[in-house]
From Swiss-Prot:
Residue ranges, annotated region (Disordered): 359-380
Species per Swiss-Prot/TrEMBL record: Vibrio vulnificus (strain YJ016)
Protein encoded by which gene: obg
Protein name in the entry: GTPase Obg
Top-rank taxon: Bacteria
Predominant place of localization: cytoplasm
HAMAP family the UniProt entry points to: GTPase_Obg
Domain Obg: 1-159
CDD domains, alphabetized: Obg
Lineage: Bacteria, Pseudomonadati, Pseudomonadota, Gammaproteobacteria, Vibrionales
Pfam families, alphabetized: GTP1_OBG (PF01018), MMR_HSR1 (PF01926)
Role according to the record: An essential GTPase which binds GTP, GDP and possibly (p)ppGpp with moderate affinity, with high nucleotide exchange rates and a fairly low GTP hydrolysis rate. Plays a role in control of the cell cycle, stress response, ribosome biogenesis and in those bacteria that undergo differentiation, in morphogenesis control.
Alphabetized InterPro entries for the sequence: G_OBG (IPR031167), GTP-bd (IPR006073), GTP-bd_Obg/CgtA (IPR014100), GTP1-OBG_CS (IPR006074), GTP1_OBG_dom (IPR006169), GTP1_OBG_dom_sf (IPR036726), OBG_GTPase (IPR045086), P-loop_NTPase (IPR027417)
GO biological process, alphabetically ordered: ribosome biogenesis
Length: 388
């Protein structure tokens, strides 16, 4: 199945049902009181995480989703039926972003989580609501409010513990093939990896973690060069980043400049991502002598001002990969989980969260006969008082 990690859809919550003007009619009761019921609320639109899904491809074919409208009220003080909600099932790790405001409306990072993305309209009021001591035959009602309409960009963010980044052909896919059962395509030309892939690394039975391999970055990626920074979003939930550096590039480029390019693109994309724990991994050390490898590594470390630990590996013959995986597993075991979790969700303002204000909408009056005068004392007949 084709991997689709982004889709644009339009959702519309149901409109609220209208209130109704009605009066009680019964045998021998010529002037019954008001009994117009309220309308029903419109249905809401939700997204829900489903672990059985792994792509957003379905939302490329159908792009409009609408919840049910609330029923109008009816006589006998009958309230209209509430509109049915609609739930859109998405892969775990999906977030919904409002295209016009760039606001994150919803984010579902665990199976079964359900979040509202569009709120249904508020119901209209029937004429019973307007009855008072001075208005015993009200002909006023209110219409239901419109349901919320949003244009959303659905983004699928892969859930992984370790994210890999580097230039094309740095050896990221070769590494993930060496340490897991994943088999991403490997070749000697740039951008062999066109879509993200995941691999599960099992160090010992009770210790395992997930590694994400994304397409390589090049200079100018933040401005759209190459595959751009589209796939960097998949690293946002990773706990550790592995910066893979090729010490013997096939295009004979400078490893120092290559390392600086990746860091620059990372900082341009997101300060939060740039501040995540990051390890340097120097790959292809088997292609040069040990002295030459150490010299190149030292140049890179000096240029970056790197003071943390680093690793030397050869992914193709698995030299140093086992030690790296063990240290990654130990590090993540000690890393506080709070640093990995998404920050507490901000409150999203929906259209009709302020119900009291919705009631202050336009009031419609129906005047087609003299029903509103049946309680007028002046119509009770002409009475003459005589003082004796």
């Amino acid at each position: 199945m084709k991997f689709v990690d982004e889709a644009v859809i339009k959702v519309q919550a149901g409109d609220g049902g209208n209130g109704v003007v009605s009066f009680w009619r019964e045998k021998f009761v010529t002037k019954g009181g008001p009994d117009g019921g309220d309308g029903g609320d419109g249905g809401d639109v939700y997204i829900q995480a489903d672990e059985n899904l792994n792509t957003l491809i379905d939302y490329r074919f159908q792009r409009f989703y609408e919840a049910e409208r609330g029923q109008n009220g009816s006589g006998g003080n009958c309230t209209g039926k509430r509109g049915k909600d609609i739930t859109l099932r998405v892969p775990v790790g999906t977030r919904a972003v409002d295209i016009h405001t760039n606001e994150i409306v919803a984010e579902v990072a665990e199976h079964g989580k359900k979040v509202m993305v569009a709120k249904g309209g508020w119901h209209g009021l029937g004429n019973t609501r307007f009855k008072s001591s001075v208005n015993r035959a009200p002909r006023q009602k209110t219409m239901g409010t419109k349901g919320e309409i949003r244009e959303l960009r659905l983004e699928l963010l892969l859930l992984a513990d370790v994210g890999m980044l580097g230039l094309p052909n740095a050896g990221k896919s070769t590494f993930i093939r060496a340490v897991s059962a994943a088999k991403p395509k490997v070749a000697d030309y740039p951008f062999t990896t066109l879509i993200p892939s995941l691999g599960v690394v099992s160090v010992v039975p009770e210790k395992s973690f997930v590694v994400a391999d994304i397409p390589g970055l090049i200079e100018g990626a933040a401005d759209g060069a190459g595959l751009g920074i589209r796939f960097l979003k998949h690293l946002e939930r990773c706990r550790v980043l592995l910066h893979m550096i090729d010490i013997f590039p096939i295009d004979q480029s400078d490893p120092v400049q290559n390392a600086l390019t990746i860091i620059d693109e990372l900082e341009q994309y997101s300060e939060k991502l740039a501040n995540k724990p990051r390890w340097l991994v120097f790959n292809k050390v088997d292609l040069v002598s040990e002295e030459q490898a150490d010299e190149i590594i030292q140049e890179v470390i000096d240029a970056l001002g790197w003071e943390e630990q680093y690793f030397k590996i050869s992914a193709v013959n698995r030299q140093g990969t086992k030690e790296l995986c063990y240290k990654l597993a130990d590090f993540m075991e000690q890393l506080p989980r709070e640093e990995q979790e998404v920050s507490e969700e901000e409150k999203v303002n929906f259209m009709w969260d302020y119900h009291p204000d919705a009631n202050q909408g336009e009031v419609i009056t129906e005047d087609d006969d003299d029903w509103d005068d049946w309680d007028d004392e002046e119509d009770d007949g002409h009475v003459i008082y005589v003082r004796e």
